[in-house]
């Protein structure tokens, strides 16, 4: 025999369902508790208790959010940038272009051609360009001493160690800058066994074969 729900019973079921919905909307929800028979108020229709574990509503608390963000942040590594040229050693030249003779180097000024006087907003740029060209040509015209280039042979010698320097020697270095409308050059000598660095530095001999002074840097230290 079929059972039919009367119209007034349908209204009662709808009203009961609305009461249950209002109850759960107004009651505080605990994240660790699930919907069970004990959480439903007495008097509601038994059909609404068919599957109490169907929905388990959980709201993350502040502690959960903190631990979640902390977990993501733990995978981020901080990048540490080493100081430039930290392992090159040597002594930094603080003011190479204002140094005086007798401190291990010589300061010279590359004089400009008096007939060439650029004007305008790019005057300093043009003067610096002219001074650089004249400085380069001045050094190119002078004879330079160079170390002999050995032929490369695969597997010969130790690949990681510095090549032997039985004779030793010095190399001339220059530091160029634009100072107060003039191109100034500071030049000095370093042992050929020392590294070549971007910053102006005094280096000491590492191989034990480089002389303390050479014919190029004798005048750098002033009169004897």
From Swiss-Prot:
A GO BP entry: symbiont-mediated suppression of host cytoplasmic pattern recognition receptor signaling pathway via inhibition of MDA-5 activity
Polar residues bias spans: 54-65
First-listed, main subcellular location of the protein, grouped into a coarse class: virion
Pfam families reported for this sequence: zf-Paramyx-P
Residues the record lists as binding Zn(2+) 1: 170, 189, 214, 217
Residues that, per the record, bind Zn(2+) 2: 193, 205, 207, 210
Function: Plays an essential role in the inhibition of host immune response. Prevents the establishment of cellular antiviral state by blocking interferon-alpha/beta (IFN-alpha/beta) production and signaling pathway. Interacts with host IFIH1/MDA5 and DHX58/LGP2 to inhibit the transduction pathway involved in the activation of IFN-beta promoter, thus protecting the virus against cell antiviral state. Blocks the type I and II interferon signaling pathways by interacting with host STAT1, STAT2 and STAT3, and mediating their ubiquitination and subsequent proteasomal degradation.
The family this protein is said to belong to: Belongs to the paramyxoviruses V protein family.
Name used for this protein in its record: Non-structural protein V
């Amino acid at each position: 025999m079929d059972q039919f729900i009367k119209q007034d019973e349908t209204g009662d079921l709808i009203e009961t369902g609305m009461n249950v919905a209002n109850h759960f909307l107004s009651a505080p929800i605990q994240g660790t508790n699930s919907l069970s028979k004990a959480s439903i108020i007495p008097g509601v229709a038994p059909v609404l208790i068919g599957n109490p574990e169907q929905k388990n509503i959980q709201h993350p608390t502040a502690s959960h959010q903190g631990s979640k963000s902390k977990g993501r942040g733990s995978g981020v590594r901080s990048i540490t940038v080493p100081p430039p040229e930290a392992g090159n050693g040597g002594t930094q030249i603080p003011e190479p272009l204002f140094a005086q003779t007798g401190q291990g180097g010589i300061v010279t000024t590359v004089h400009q051609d008096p007939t060439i006087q650029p004007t305008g907003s790019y005057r300093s740029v043009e003067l610096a360009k002219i001074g650089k060209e004249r400085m380069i040509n001045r050094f190119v015209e002078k004879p330079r001493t160079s170390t002999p280039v050995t032929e490369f042979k695969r597997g010969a010698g130790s690949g990681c160690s510095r090549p032997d320097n039985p004779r030793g020697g010095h190399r001339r270095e220059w530091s160029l800058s634009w100072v107060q409308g003039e191109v100034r050059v500071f030049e000095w000598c370093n042992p050929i066994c020392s590294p070549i660095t971007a910053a102006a530095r005094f280096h000491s001999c590492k191989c034990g074969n480089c002389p303390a002074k050479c014919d190029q840097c004798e005048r750098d230290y002033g009169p004897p």
